[in-house]
Amino acid sequence: MSQNRRLFTSESVTEGHPDKICDQISDSILDEILKKDPNARVACETSVTTGLVLVSGEITTSTYVDIPKTVRDTIKEIGYTRAKYGFDAETCAVLTSIDEQSADIAQGVDKALEAREGTMTEEELDAIGAGDQGLMFGFANNETEELMPLPISLAHKLSLRLTEVRKDQTLAYLRPDGKTQVTVEYDDQNKPVRIDTVVISTQHAPEVTLEQIQSDLKEHVISPVVPSELIDEQTKYFINPTGRFVIGGPQGDAGLTGRKIIVDTYGGYARHGGGAFSGKDATKVDRSAAYAARYVAKNIVAAGLADSCEVQLAYAIGVAQPVSISIDTFGTGKASEEKLIEVVRANFDLRPAGIIKMLDLRRPIYKQTAAYGHFGRHDLDLPWEKTDKADTLRQEALGQ
């Protein structure tokens, strides 16, 4: 590797990873509630370990959801359907401990500070306040068609492919738990030029040999996903490098909702505000504002206003307007960052109520995001992935 080149690595996990099981359970419960009560307040946390699922949190809703059934259906769909996998949807215990949202938090969310103090316009009076303080980041760059960094894009595609060949029985000996990792080499212009390393660890049946797993994964998982022009004779492969991965899922490691926030976002390529997504309704800005920030960043890059763009939003609990908006184009901007913030403020309503309306977030669309990333998903129709504002932004920022 020449002196001016650098390596960057991102990882992904499959839907059978213990932490991802929890994310999917939390978002399945959220979706079931939103189907019947779009205005519900949900903060649902899940923990899994050998033979046990614990669902806890704060839920305020007018509807009833059969939580144990939702939990079991989700685990079954992931593929933990036999006791020999160490976790079984039919026989695992499901415990629930659910409270209502705190009245102190609710008063700030139900009516924003601006409404309580009379500083909002009539049009704004119904706006909700942010459900918490915090900072959220959104990012986009032009490394891939979906405007995501290449390392996380490839890591997710490998994880998704790993699940596909398990579920369609191409590799019937695979089991649900798995992880992927991709290291990309960048040149001195910060352009990806080759794949340096691919790591895949997958749970498997005990009778299969390591040699067969390595051969099959190269043929059926890596080859269909990783662009051949980025692979050379120096590319390294580590496939099940421990030699054996039979004990996996919640039997191998306990899992928790919100433990895979870098996998969920940009693979470490952009900054992260620290808040997790799954199990939270859209009044929680941890989720909705991170989606809005991605929407803004993606439209800026799609408009040709920058090759790379990171957007930061920040909120105070119970206050509707963001306390700050920051944009960094890393020296690639075609307009000043001040100008970009100006056109963003003019074209995106970044109050919580505005985000919910702009992205139509009171729908049951969340479970599908709970594995393989919330961003850059061409296989899903996600509102924050649209580039419908790109033309307007270009016109207003550059006058063309």
Curated annotation (Swiss-Prot):
Keywords: ATP-binding, Cytoplasm, Magnesium, Metal-binding, Nucleotide-binding, One-carbon metabolism, Potassium, Transferase
Main location: cytoplasm
Swiss-Prot/TrEMBL cofactor(s): Mg(2+); K(+)
Residues annotated as binding ATP: H17, D177, G178, K179, R244, F245, D253, R259, K260, A276, K280
Zinc-finger as UniProt keyword: no
Superkingdom as given in the UniProt entry: Bacteria
Compartments (UniProt record): Cytoplasm
Pfam families (UniProt xref): S-AdoMet_synt_C (PF02773), S-AdoMet_synt_M (PF02772), S-AdoMet_synt_N (PF00438)
Catalyses which reaction(s): L-methionine + ATP + H2O = S-adenosyl-L-methionine + phosphate + diphosphate
Database matches in SUPFAM superfamilies: S-adenosylmethionine synthetase (SSF55973)
Function: Catalyzes the formation of S-adenosylmethionine (AdoMet) from methionine and ATP. The overall synthetic reaction is composed of two sequential steps, AdoMet formation and the subsequent tripolyphosphate hydrolysis which occurs prior to release of AdoMet from the enzyme.
Protein name, UniProt field: S-adenosylmethionine synthase
